[in-house]
């Protein structure tokens, strides 16, 4: 079977490969081109353009873009059914002509399309209807006269089943972490001795902590399917009368789990800073996290960097003026400048481009690491989706929009496939993922207990929190 190129090779700087389509295709029914670039088409014509025949195989860029965006218009199992039907029709035509050479030409192309679908969008096949169609078509290919494809079909199915099994295992771990999560204050009330344990007793080296954070980031990134970026913004297609499949398509559990990790890390940072009783210990903890954040920046782990900065900027932490007075903040000021939201995060975007360029020319796994500030990536995709229509006035699919969407998502796909080069420290990872953190109210209470309220509003809140959380007046 032909080898598929890496995602980074799929799109040029303009958003898509400009040399995919020959001028002879300009007159293809239902597809509209400009300067040989596919701009729009009817949904039916785009589906036909996806399916290979004896003389044609779609470019990988088109396959990825259409499989990614088609779920805005139809459920993947509906697309799979149409693709299977067209593939079977092509096979029948070849068989009807009695030309075995034609069969030999088309079978590997169909198998390659199915392989690309299962490799890039494996989560589509959690749907039994998808898996049934895939097995039916794969069986048809493997049981024909051409037995040479049986091994390739088996490899494709085994690889898909492994990926789905790994996803199920990952989801079980997430569910277990979620079910055992408790509030830090509750733990301290029942086990006061646990207050002695903090992040610095578990991992005294900020560089090691930054590396372990990168492990968590890359693992969670790896489980996000590219389709989740589209499914997060699925809305009812006005030309679609099936109301039920809209809600079915909105599956974004791994994306949501990653956003929850960002929030957890921010709260963990704030908890670790607010928990120490002594001012010098709080100041030391702030400086520790500044060093962790700086190393995250050097690694290219912008998501952990931003989570740490967010935690340090939470009100219960930022109000600790006496503590901050003891902190050397020069390094923190530089990091805040890098992640400054002004001018649409211009400084961060510049740093991200630099990291992405470094990744392309990398000589080591460490240099390949690019972990974007995830919430901003989601926001960019959201505004791209909101800023352009999915369908043109004539009912055609606005494919120009989806080239750009696919460009952004394919870049993410390249980054998420990087293997973490750092040694795993299970003790540190366990602490980061499972140690209880303070709720927002508990953070404020700890902050007021460390440095008393400065005005009447804070005094009233302190009294209220002591009463509700500690049962004290």
From Swiss-Prot:
Pfam family, one: RasGEF
Keyword Manganese on entry: no
Cellular component GO terms, alphabetical: early endosome; late endosome; midbody
SUPFAM superfamilies according to UniProt: Ras GEF (SSF48366)
Record's keyword annotation contains Thylakoid: no
SUBUNIT field: Interacts with CCDC124 during cytokinesis. Interacts with Ras family proteins.
Protein name in UniProt: Ras-GEF domain-containing family member 1B
Organism for this UniProt entry: Mus musculus
